[in-house]
Amino acid sequence: MPAVLLVLYVNPPPSVCILTQKLSLGLYNQWWRVCRSVPPPWYVFFNKRSMSTFKLMMDGRLVFAMAIAILSVVLSCGTCEKAKRAVRGRQDRPKEFPPPRYNYTILTRYNATALASPFINDQVKNVDLRIVTATRPCEMIALIAKTNIDSILKELAAAQKTYSARLTWFKIMPTCATPIHDVSYMKCNPKLSFAMCDERSDILWQASLITMAAETDDELGLVLAAPAHSASGLYRRVIEIDGRRIYTDFSVTIPSERCPIAFEQNFGNPDRCKTPEQYSRGEVFTRRFLGEFNFPQGEHMTWLKFWFVYDGGNLPVQFYEAQAFARPVPPDNHPGFDSVESEITQNKTDPKPGQADPKPNQPFKWPSIKHLAPRLDEVDEVIEPVTKPPKTSKSNSTFVGISVGLGIAGLVLVGVILYVCLRRKKELKKSAQNGLTRLRSTFKDVKYTQLP
């Protein structure tokens, strides 16, 4: 039994959080059968003629009850953060929420539109690629990149017409793409900022990302709080404005060190990860596998930061735009006007006798566009940087030390109790075999006098 408790303490399953009290009660009842020769606890407190508290502790009942209580507290407080995080919103709330950017009406019918394919068929299309690298585990990162949306909105404003838009984030996998966030906008005024529209659809999120992801203030970027290593890879943002699409790729790298407050993600689930053929046939409806989370952007971001700090994370001072992919610069000897002019000069001057002709400049081979913007076949090949070990928090280390100490103390107490109870039972059995009956010394304190 102590070994089982030790395993549950080191690596408990999610059900431990709910069944901790029942487990403690069950162990208590099972051990009561071994130590049933000892009076129950309430006999001590309600019967003045009971045996002393010291004798009760030696028999093991009170000590065992204290050990079970200590182990229950350790199991429920030290190992159930993930389960408590899902329901703590009802218990803890941020003090203030920012006002919404604008007022809008949510209409569910906009979610009935099939999702366009995130895959790019044009092999020469230039896609903006950004690099996002987390320097340590349990870090909050942002996927931010400026676009040419303002020029499109100016054209629409000059034409004096409203527009409709759709913003979707995808996690690109080797053979499929998983939508993780989707929202549609209708009746938008081009004179205002993007997404400030009168109507919009339900705000859809992948359920496992609600407590670890949120939109930036302009609703164009994505903030990830303490992402796990499984969140590494390629993310693609698709902005569609009146049929025109803008693609932006983010190559995200997360350290392989384990983060205790991170949630592992399964982006390759076939129920959500759709193939290019399914997108082309118009079979992808995000309403079927994404969950609603109709909180305004400011309120959602406030919740995200609150949960992150509650779990022990450190908020960044400011979110910066992701670094653009450094495109290669052509070398000095690439074919151009200078090389053509030098060739003409060389043709006019004859080389000296006995001197070999100089070797012509090798033409520069431009890299394939596939290396500038990773495509479907190599989206998850992310180079992991060499990171320093994460800084350990004093509060976390202190709590872990106290928890381990309490657990060891509880196990020692359980072992002592088991030894005392088994020895007592053995003595009673031996006395019964010898024909001796153990009598309770109820009157052991009565003074005896010799009769005349």
Curated annotation (Swiss-Prot):
Chain segments carrying region Disordered? 331-365
A Pfam cross-reference name: Herpes_glycop_D
Segments passing through the bilayer: 406-422
Indicate yes or no for the key word Membrane. Answer: yes
Q: Which GO terms describe its cellular component?
A: membrane; viral envelope; virion membrane
Keywords in UniProt for this one? Disulfide bond, Glycoprotein, Host-virus interaction, Membrane, Signal, Transmembrane, Transmembrane helix, Viral attachment to host cell, Viral attachment to host entry receptor, Viral envelope protein, Virion, Virus entry into host cell
List the signal peptide residues. 1-19
This chain's function reads: Envelope glycoprotein that binds to host cell entry receptors, promoting the virus entry into host cells. May trigger fusion with host membrane, by recruiting the fusion machinery composed of gB and gH/gL.
Name of the protein described by the UniProt record:
Envelope glycoprotein D
Q: What gene does the UniProt entry assign to this protein?
A: gD
